[in-house]
Amino acid sequence: MGRMHSKGKGIASSALPYVRSPPAWCKADADSVVEQILKFSKKGMSPSQIGVTLRDSHGIPQVRFITGQKIMRILKANGLAPELPEDLYNLIKKAVSVRKHLERNRKDKDSKFRLILIESRIHRLARYYRKVGALPPTWKYESATASALVA
């Protein structure tokens, strides 16, 4: 899939292993993995940060192969899922930081243009999440209240 606001084709990506069972060297059981996920979530980590931490520090290659569920589904089942989807949250955070930069540097035309691109991505993603039901139908992105969403 190509990039939205640039010329890149986006060919490179990591490939999941063909075998969908946990590898023989992985000794973790499903209950301990779920416990660790909930512990990290209570510390304030995002789902992708939880996955990276489990992979790098605890030797758990794929949570889904061990537990049978993705990290977000585990968090939703335990009531710890974030209110905003993670990709939308990260875009809003980026838009807030660019807007803050523009307050200090009013003549930065390139950042002004990039802010327009970021906000158009936010609107597109919000439209998708409203359609799917991950966001309420009345949810709307407003730049004035965006810093409160991220804080």
Swiss-Prot record:
Keywords: Cytoplasm, Phosphoprotein, Ribonucleoprotein, Ribosomal protein. GO terms for biological process: cytoplasmic translation. GO terms for molecular function: small ribosomal subunit rRNA binding; structural constituent of ribosome. One of its GO terms (cellular component) is cytosolic small ribosomal subunit. The modification Phosphoserine is found at residues 21, 32. InterPro entries: Ribosomal_uS15, Ribosomal_uS15_arc_euk, Ribosomal_uS15_N, uS15_NS1_RNA-bd_sf. It comes from the Eukaryota. It holds the Pfam family Ribosomal_S13_N. It is found in: Cytoplasm. SUPFAM superfamilies: S15/NS1 RNA-binding domain. Disulfide bonds: none annotated. HAMAP family: Ribosomal_uS15_A. Component of the small ribosomal subunit (SSU). Mature yeast ribosomes consist of a small (40S) and a large (60S) subunit. The 40S small subunit contains 1 molecule of ribosomal RNA (18S rRNA) and at least 33 different proteins. The large 60S subunit contains 3 rRNA molecules (25S, 5.8S and 5S rRNA) and at least 46 different proteins. Component of the ribosome, a large ribonucleoprotein complex responsible for the synthesis of proteins in the cell. The small ribosomal subunit (SSU) binds messenger RNAs (mRNAs) and translates the encoded message by selecting cognate aminoacyl-transfer RNA (tRNA) molecules. The large subunit (LSU) contains the ribosomal catalytic site termed the peptidyl transferase center (PTC), which catalyzes the formation of peptide bonds, thereby polymerizing the amino acids delivered by tRNAs into a polypeptide chain. Belongs to the universal ribosomal protein uS15 family. This is Small ribosomal subunit protein uS15. The gene is rps13.
